[in-house]
Amino acid sequence: RLYITNESVRRLNHVDRKRGRTFSPRIAFASLYMISGESVNWLSASEKYQLKKRLTTLNATDLVSLCRNRARLCSMWCRESRLEKVTQEIRLSAGTGELAAEFNLTETSDVEGYLLESDLQRIVEQAKLRSDFQPANVRLHVSSYIPNGSGNMPIGVCSADLADSLDVRECGAGFDKLTQLLSRFQSDNKGKDSR
């Protein structure tokens, strides 16, 4: 089935498609981890070198566009009493909980985070998530690949999620932080040509 909603049309219109082929989830996460100063041990040395070289030429808009296929977004409704269960099962991202302060956003009870495709059905059933209720208070980024780790996603991933948001404040906060992270990464790697 294919569902076309106002939100999906606005989201598609929001995407900038100008700059080349999109990254695979593995490379998209690596790029967002790399600009966050995190380890990307799932890449080979040559892949790291090529990615570093590519990241030194990108701006925030290009990076968001290239990383757009890292996960698909599922917006769902959940009872307030079950939100904690969802929070424990995913890697939090965007402006969820205490992450909101990092972006000067107001903290809400909404939950946003990442999980593997193989875990989606289990979490939907356990937390009794509903896609047919509004407003959605759970946004799940479902991916075929998520780097190993626990806790919140790195700040680069959170920034990209916010930059993809249809909310103007969230989008602006995400792009501002991505611009800062990229600028720092590019100045730290300027002129370096080592593997």
Question: Can you say where each PLM-predicted feature lies in the sequence?
Answer:
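Long, low-complexity, charge-rich intrinsically disordered regions
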Residues: 74-195
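Helix N-cap and loop-to-helix transition residues
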Residues: 5, 22-25, 44, 59, ...
